[in-house]
C-alpha cells in the first residue's frame, strides 16, 4: 500500500487529470504536459495526445545542469522517479539533472537542439528497434562531443523501464505474500507425534 501511495503522490506532483470526449465517449486520464501546451494522456483504455505533440523538457531551478536523462515516454519518466525514490528514500537526487521526455521516438529530432546544452546524456529508451534507432540518432549528432549512455541495460530483459518497475512491484508483492503465509501457518510442535 505504501508503494501505491508513493506512486500516486508522485503522479499528482508531475501530472494532472484530464477529462475529455473521444468518439462520443467521456473519459478521464492522467495528463502529462509537454513544452507546447499539449498533453500526453493515458488511462487503461486510451493512449493519446491532446495536441500539439511535443517533447517535455524538465529543467531544474538554480544553476544549469550538465546532465540530462532522456525518456521515450512519461510513464518511463515516472517509473524512473519512483525507482530512484524507493532505492534512495532519504536522498533520491532527483534534481541533480534535467530531464527530456520525447513523448514519442518520432520526436527525437526535436530533442537534439536542447541536448546540445549538456555534457552527459543518459538515454532510457525502450529495448526495441525504435529505441535503439533513437539512441543512434543522438549518438550520430553528439557522439564525438558528449558522453552518451545507453541506460536501457539497466532493465535488460524488459521492454521498458515501466515494465521493469511493474516486475519489481510484483516481485515485492509475492515476497510479502509468502512472508504473510509463513507468519499465519500454525507452529510445529517439538518432538514426535504418534
Language-model features: where?
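Helix N-cap/coil-helix junction residues
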Residues: 6-7, 68
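Phosphate-handling DNA/RNA-contact segment within nucleic-acid enzymes
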Residues: 20-114
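TOPRIM fold recognition
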Residues: 82-194
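Short, small-residue-biased leader/transition segments that mark boundaries at the very start
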Residues: 1-5
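Sparse, context-dependent recognition of short Cys/His-centered cofactor- or disulfide-binding micro-motifs
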Residues: 17, 24, 65, 123, ...
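Short, basic/aromatic recognition patches
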Residues: 7-22
Amino acid at each position: 500500500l505504501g508503494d501505491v501511495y508513493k506512486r500516486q503522490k508522485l503522479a499528482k506532483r508531475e501530472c494532472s487529470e484530464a477529462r475529455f470526449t473521444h468518439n462520443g465517449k467521456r473519459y478521464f486520464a492522467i495528463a502529462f504536459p509537454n513544452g507546447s501546451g499539449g498533453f500526453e494522456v493515458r488511462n487503461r483504455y486510451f493512449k493519446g495526445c491532446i495536441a500539439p505533440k511535443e517533447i517535455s523538457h524538465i529543467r531544474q531551478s538554480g544553476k544549469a545542469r550538465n546532465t540530462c536523462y532522456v525518456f521515450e515516454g512519461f510513464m518511463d519518466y515516472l517509473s524512473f522517479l519512483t525507482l530512484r525514490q524507493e532505492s534512495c528514500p532519504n536522498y533520491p537526487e532527483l534534481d541533480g539533472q534535467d530531464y527530456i521526455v520525447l513523448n514519442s521516438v518520432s520526436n527525437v529530432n526535436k530533442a537534439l537542439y536542447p541536448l546540445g546544452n549538456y555534457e552527459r546524456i543518459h538515454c532510457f529508451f525502450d529495448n526495441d528497434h525504435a529505441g535503439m534507432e533513437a539512441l543512434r540518432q543522438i549518438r550520430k549528432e553528439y557522439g564525438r562531443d558528449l558522453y552518451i549512455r545507453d541506460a536501457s541495460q539497466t532493465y535488460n530483459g524488459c521492454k521498458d523501464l515501466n515494465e521493469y518497475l511493474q516486475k519489481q512491484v510484483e516481485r515485492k508483492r509475492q515476497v510479502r505474500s509468502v512472508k504473510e503465509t509463513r507468519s499465519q501457518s500454525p507452529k510445529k510442535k517439538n518432538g514426535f507425534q504418534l
